[in-house]
Regions:
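Short, positively charged and aromatic/hydrophobic N-terminal segments
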Residues: 2, 7-13
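Active-site neighborhood of HAD-like aspartate-dependent phosphohydrolases
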Residues: 17-69
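A general structural motif
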Residues: 17-19, 104-106, 156-158, 176
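Anion (oxyanion) recognition and catalysis
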Residues: 42, 97-101, 173
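Short, basic/glycine-rich phosphate-binding loops at helix/coil junctions
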Residues: 64-79, 104-108, 131
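Substrate-recognition element of Asp-dependent hydrolases with the DxDx(T/V) motif
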Residues: 83-88, 92-127
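Substrate-recognition "cap/lid" segment bordering the active-site pocket of phosphatases
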Residues: 110-160, 166-170
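Asp-based, Mg2+/Mn2+-dependent phosphohydrolase catalytic module
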Residues: 149-155, 159, 165-211
Length: 211
């Protein structure tokens, strides 16, 4: 089930489900969006800058990409057929399935993908193909949208919130979620009061250690 932000239903859950629900981003957390986007861009003649891993902003990654065009290019990619075939990020497949199959956790994905219905269907198809029934639902926001509003229904719930964008992880922490930041070159120097992890093995150990 995918839900666009303009028709988003606040999903109700009882206390037993709450304890086994994990909120997570998709790109840069479950899926390797950056690698797939890089391949797609290079096929279209864009070349990577020497320090492309150090910035979150894509116009710093490609020599030919101007800041004013970056969001449009991302939206074009996110609404292309390629978005249905992103690979899993690092060891996410193994540990997401362990958390689900061995410990009963389910994952609600909150992703700033697109409001395009076809793109949303491809995103859910991609996630379910890799992670199966571990995916409880997929909430799709506009391309690059902030997640403040989408996270607000979970205020003070104490749910885990797994992200790679520091601003979104910070918001989760501020409203009472257990934020976990997945480390990348663009965020590795972010100072925060919540855990920063390199892979899903570390996420698994954090969650099971507190279970």
């Amino acid at each position: 089930m995918y839900l666009a932000v303009d028709t988003m239903v606040i999903l109700l859950y009882n206390s037993s489900m709450k304890n086994k629900l994990i909120l997570t981003d998709a790109d840069g957390v479950l899926l390797d969006w950056e690698w797939a986007f890089s391949v797609w861009m290079q096929e279209r003649g864009y070349t990577l800058t020497a320090d492309n891993k150090k910035s979150y902003y894509l116009h710093h990654h490609y020599n030919e990409l101007e800041e004013k065009d970056a969001k449009k290019v991302v939206r074009t990619f996110n609404e292309s057929a390629a978005i249905g075939f992103l690979p899993a990020l690092r060891d996410s497949t193994f540990y997401v399935k362990r958390l689900h199959e061995e410990h009963g956790y389910q994952f609600r994905v909150i992703t700033s993908l697109s409001l395009d219905k076809d793109a949303q269907r491809l995103r859910e198809m991609n996630l379910r193909k890799i992670f199966g029934d571990a995916i409880e639902s997929v909430i799709c926001l506009a391309t690059g949208a902030d997640k403040d509003e989408a996270l607000e229904p979970y205020r003070d719930s104490g749910l885990y919130w797994i992200e790679d964008k520091p601003a979104n992880a910070d918001v989760g922490h501020e409203i009472g979620l257990k934020s976990i930041l997945v480390e990348h070159g663009h965020n590795m120097h972010h100072k925060c009061a919540y855990p920063v992890v390199k892979n899903w093995k570390e996420i698994y150990e954090l969650i099971i250690g507190r279970d």
